[in-house]
């Protein structure tokens, strides 16, 4: 056992979002450790970021040298660990030259946070997605079209000549969470499950006419109470209604456009359908 050399991180990549803290501990091209923790910006105070980072990766830090930590996402917001000012579009996604240094207490780490992107008219911002976009463009250097990044706040991003030229954000994921977990609908909606046919019907229904969306949402509760709708069916319709509303609003981004969808498998599949 004494002959085995312990592997330490060469550097650590972090995506610190609104809802989750994702990290990858890297040695060359090898991932030593990866995890997703429900410790997003919504749940943390400014002085808690370093504590949770060290708790997650501390045993893989070389005590004899400084390990670079590169962070994107909401850790760089005004309410995050340390603010990294936005770059204005049109712009190429930020790279290491734009990363802002962060003061840390632990002497084993050198922390930098990448800035997000801002759009003046209409006003919009992104943090974290711009780094995902950079990864896409590094692998698809001639990509011109639209990138859809589903999530808590879904982004529709138009790319031309390697630059982000405009984008639009929809709070679809957060609205689904609030309605299914914090509203009167929480008693009528399951925690999981999916009915593809109902989802497609619900999406098309709202794309065609969304004037009565508020009423249709309460219909979910009424139909459940009257035993005409299961919790799984209710969850599916709620998701379909909200994604349908988003697709109706984002039509200029996807209609007749080349679209690349980047996100977790389950939610990306919903958008692809």
Enumerate the language-model features and the residues they cover.
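Short glycine-rich, Thr/Ser-proximal phosphate-binding strand/loop in the N-terminal lobe
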Residues: 11-49
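Phosphate/pyrophosphate-binding loops at sites that engage ATP/ADP/AMP, CoA/4′-phosphopantetheine
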Residues: 53-68, 247-255
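Glycine-rich phosphate-binding loop plus the immediately following alpha-helix
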Residues: 42-44, 117-209
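Short acidic-glycine loop/turn motifs at beta-strand connectors
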Residues: 26-30, 107, 158-163
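A short acidic Gly-Thr/Ser loop motif
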Residues: 14-20, 74, 148-153, 172, ...
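Short beta-strand-loop/turn "lid" adjacent to the catalytic site in phosphate-handling enzymes
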Residues: 62-126
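Short glycine-rich phosphate-binding loop at a beta-alpha junction
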Residues: 65-77, 151, 243, 256-265
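ATP-binding/phosphotransfer module of carbohydrate and carboxylate kinases, centering on a glycine-rich
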Residues: 21, 26, 184-273
